[in-house]
């Protein structure tokens, strides 16, 4: 192992450097009685350690910055008054000051340094060095990223360095023109990330995802916020795009298939590959019987976040008093059915967009044309039901470009173009699957959704009789094995079909209004015809 010298990063006086600690050592460090505040880890009844992340129980998008310089100024998709996103500009001068705060915080301390890879493909992976002062943060990245072999560690040269100074604050933030004492900043030229005043583990995970989303498409590789799996022969690859709560993790974790990964993937000339070495699953209301794979992954070496334990370490998965965003990170080998030894598979044959439509308009499955594929990918639609106390309240739509707008560093059309190129080359087909509601006022059953996914993956959908749905011009099957035929045309689920039409007009208008932002260039204008026609 190379001797770790942190002085080249401006971090001096380290009292001890714990390098790539083992799980045994991490457990010992996390559960030490001398730990204070959010350093404290508690052992749960299942063997996994539970930690709290303080006021930040999710990412802090208003505090995300990218340094504006020669390399980034014309490539990054910057936020603007007209179209807001999370890529806020930061000057090189402010970056230097923020980095100084992190360096000062990390100097003269006991530190943990974890070297790991982001990306299962050796040609394009990013070697990342994480410098942290909290044991469980080292545990988190050990779970979530890909472990180098002993040989790879011998000559490990980081492509990217992450400084996690979660205990520090940007006290002079107003003077620096920042949003708050919290700062998550990226420098694309120096290949560095600085994290200040947030303990949320996901900032390190999604930070590196954002950087892969910057570098890979510029090399002609599709970078995707999706889950992916393949058949037992490792041949029939499928990818599942979808926003939080649409079923990405649940539907890709399938006992009949092998999981490639549950959240972040690339697609190059060799096929689809995972960026990660672990999974970061939501555990609110986790039920042992309906999600056994995730439940069984919660054991020693897994790390729970913001989950409530009693004094005996008993977990209450239903308790959302800290946050609804309770999570667990675990190494991917905690799931039995995974692609081994490398999380990759050939090019995808099927691309599935998951939308949970609370308006009750979209069919449970639509077969998309290439133009519709781009349109619905750029739209990135899902909808939640706000406050479903009694009866259905107002659905709130979310349009998140490429089903992952928060992590896009380039213009969304770049990601759409790369995806379409890869799909054309492999002959992949795309489907829009609604895991949300229909005219019955109930959510489409997971049994029917799984039947739909099975029909897509087996190819049965390609020989099914179809019809066209008006307004959206969707081609939908009229029968599929194992699926209730009465739900396939959403109009049939309403007592009065005109009610569907009223809701469909409303939703179609929302799609059209959202898509205006992509019509600034010819490629975007050409796709308008693939959207709903009123």
Swiss-Prot record:
One of its GO terms (biological process) is gluconeogenesis. Mn(2+) binds at residues 206, 225, 263. Substrate binds at residues 59, 200, 206, 327. It is found in: Cytoplasm. Pathway: Carbohydrate biosynthesis; gluconeogenesis. It is an enzyme of class 4 (lyase). The keyword Nucleotide-binding applies. Its cofactor is Mn(2+). Gene3D superfamilies: 3.90.228.20, Phosphoenolpyruvate Carboxykinase, domain 1, Phosphoenolpyruvate Carboxykinase, domain 2. CDD domains: PEPCK_ATP (cd00484). Disulfide bonds: none annotated. Binds 1 Mn(2+) ion per subunit. Signal peptide: none annotated. InterPro entries: PEP_carboxykinase_ATP, PEP_carboxykinase_C, PEP_carboxykinase_N, PEPCK_ATP_CS. ATP binds at residues 206, 225, 242-250, 291, 327, 443-444, 449. It catalyses: oxaloacetate + ATP = phosphoenolpyruvate + ADP + CO2. Its EC number is 4.1.1.49. One of its GO terms (cellular component) is cytosol. Involved in the gluconeogenesis. Catalyzes the conversion of oxaloacetate (OAA) to phosphoenolpyruvate (PEP) through direct phosphoryl transfer between the nucleoside triphosphate and OAA. PANTHER family: PHOSPHOENOLPYRUVATE CARBOXYKINASE (ATP), PHOSPHOENOLPYRUVATE CARBOXYKINASE ATP. Belongs to the phosphoenolpyruvate carboxykinase (ATP) family. This is Phosphoenolpyruvate carboxykinase (ATP). The gene is pckA.
């Amino acid at each position: 192992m190379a001797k770790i010298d942190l002085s080249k990063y401006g971090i001096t006086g380290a009292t001890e450097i714990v390098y790539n600690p083992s799980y045994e050592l991490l457990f010992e460090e996390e559960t030490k009685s001398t730990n204070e505040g959010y350093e404290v880890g508690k052992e749960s009844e299942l063997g996994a350690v539970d930690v709290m992340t303080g006021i930040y129980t999710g990412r802090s998008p208003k505090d995300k910055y990218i340094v504006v310089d020669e390399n980034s100024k014309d490539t990054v998709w910057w936020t603007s008054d007209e179209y807001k996103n999370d890529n806020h500009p930061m000057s090189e001068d402010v970056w230097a000051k923020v980095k100084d705060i992190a360096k000062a915080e990390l100097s003269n301390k006991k530190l943990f340094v974890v070297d790991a890879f982001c990306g299962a493909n050796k040609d394009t992976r990013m070697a990342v060095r994480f410098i942290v002062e909290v044991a469980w943060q080292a545990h988190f990245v050990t779970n979530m990223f890909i472990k180098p072999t002993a040989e790879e560690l011998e000559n490990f040269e980081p492509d990217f360095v992450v400084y996690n100074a979660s205990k520090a604050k940007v006290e002079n933030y107003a003077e620096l023109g920042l949003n708050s004492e919290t700062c998550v900043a990226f420098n694309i030229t120096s290949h560095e990330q600085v994290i200040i005043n947030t303990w949320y583990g996901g900032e390190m995970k999604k930070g590196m995802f954002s950087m892969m989303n910057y570098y890979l498409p510029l090399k002609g590789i599709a970078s995707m916020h999706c889950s992916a799996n393949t058949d037992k022969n490792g041949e029939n690859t499928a990818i599942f795009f979808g926003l939080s709560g649409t079923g990405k993790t649940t539907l890709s974790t399938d006992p009949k298939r092998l999981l490639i990964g549950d959240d972040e993937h690339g697609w190059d000339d060799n096929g689809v590959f995972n960026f990660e070495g672990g999974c970061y699953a939501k555990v609110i209301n986790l039920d042992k019987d309906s999600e056994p794979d995730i439940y069984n992954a919660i054991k020693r070496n897994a790390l729970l976040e913001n989950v409530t334990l009693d004094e005996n370490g008993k977990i209450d998965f239903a308790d959302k008093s800290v946050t609804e965003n309770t999570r667990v990170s675990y190494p991917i080998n905690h799931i039995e059915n995974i692609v081994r030894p490398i999380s990759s598979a050939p090019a995808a044959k099927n691309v599935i967009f998951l939308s949970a439509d609370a308006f009750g308009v979209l069919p449970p499955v639509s077969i998309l044309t290439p133009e519709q594929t781009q349109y619905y990918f750029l739209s990135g639609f899902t909808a939640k039901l706000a406050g479903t106390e009694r009866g259905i309240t107002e659905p709130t739509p979310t349009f998140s470009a490429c089903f992952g707008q928060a992590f896009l560093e380039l213009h969304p059309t770049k990601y759409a173009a790369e995806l379409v190129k890869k799909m054309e080359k492999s002959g992949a087909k795309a489907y829009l699957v609604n895991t949300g509601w229909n005219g019955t006022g109930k959510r489409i059953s997971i049994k029917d959704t799984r039947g739909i996914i099975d029909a897509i993956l087996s190819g049965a959908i390609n020989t099914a009789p179809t019809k066209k749905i008006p307004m959206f011009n969707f081609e939908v099957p009229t029968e599929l094995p194992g699926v209730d035929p009465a739900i396939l045309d959403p109009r049939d689920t309403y007592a009065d079909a005109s009610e569907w039409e009223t809701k469909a007009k409303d939703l179609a208008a929302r799609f059209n209004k959202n898509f205006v932002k992509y019509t600034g260039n010819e490629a975007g204008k050409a796709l308008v015809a693939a959207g709903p026609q009123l």
